[in-house]
Amino acid sequence: MNLQKFSRYPLTFGPTPIQPLKRLSAHLGGKVELYAKRDDCNSGLAFGGNKTRKLEYLIPDALAQGCDTLVSIGGIQSNQTRQVAAVAAHLGMKCVLVQENWVNYHDAVYDRVGNIQMSRMMGADVRLVPDGFDIGFRKSWEDALADVRARGGKPYAIPAGCSDHPLGGLGFVGFAEEVRAQEAELGFQFDYVVVCSVTGSTQAGMVVGFAADGRADRVIGVDASAKPAQTREQILRIAKHTADRVELGRDITSADVVLDERFGGPEYGLPNEGTLEAIRLCAKLEGVLTDPVYEGKSMHGMIEKVRLGEFPAGSKVLYAHLGGVPALNAYSFLFRDG
């Protein structure tokens, strides 16, 4: 496998720490050891997160093409668009963000706080569009790219989640390589890695990265899209493409993609009672915050899998914390009493 042949622009602090979740593990019976890899703490650029890790491989391509404007898309409380805005500000580039109405949630401040507030503060041209949720290519995004060109700019197209991009899976191939180096220092291997999945390239990159030592199917994706068939297809397609790009040496098959579909409902961006319980439990036991859209759902999935005995006793499970906490501000009514 050859990740080193790709240019990488440093936007993160370096390898992210792995933290034992001792109190949460004990609360759940102590038979499974839980750890978190803190990609939510990976950068000083507007809180960072998993998209910042991905953007390290997209930015050299944007600079090589002489682009002057980063154009991306997400929901109103998109972590993706906030991280793209931060990187654009850091590099002195312009930024156009299409923010669609992906979440069926209504709050007086939903489009004024959290991620979208930060994007505006960092100088991004934020464009609210009423279209609903989908993880495919969007006309509103294509229109924004065309508008930049019409105004004489040179846009660089960054799709939702950085996912459906030729380089979108590389960052999390690097995540797997990073974990392997940390495992050597820790003196043990993780039996499972739990990760949230929606647009697919985070899990796809991990699948490829961990396939290098035979652990592709130990990456347990937790769907948060509530459209798991679409998410699964995208993970597999991106993983196949990424495996070819990094010269993995074997094909990625559907057996390599494990996606738990039980925790994504009722809809994308709407937490269920299990999501909210997991958010509160992790906060109170560990001081680790997760959000209602993504990490709360993957945390719920991990907790429930421990409770149901789906991880064998003695397992060491690594939770990939991808970020997303700024969105908590947009759901403040749900947490008005803690």
UniProtKB/Swiss-Prot annotation:
Annotated positions of the N6-(pyridoxal phosphate)lysine modification: K51
Q: Which UniProt keywords apply?
A: Hydrolase, Pyridoxal phosphate
- GO annotation terms (biological process): 1-aminocyclopropane-1-carboxylate metabolic process; amine catabolic process
Q: Which domain of life is it from?
A: Bacteria
Tell me one GO molecular function of this protein: 1-aminocyclopropane-1-carboxylate deaminase activity
Gene3D superfamilies from the UniProt entry: 3.40.50.1100
**Role of this protein:** Catalyzes a cyclopropane ring-opening reaction, the irreversible conversion of 1-aminocyclopropane-1-carboxylate (ACC) to ammonia and alpha-ketobutyrate. Allows growth on ACC as a nitrogen source.
Q: What is this protein called?
A: 1-aminocyclopropane-1-carboxylate deaminase
UniProt organism field: Burkholderia mallei (strain ATCC 23344)
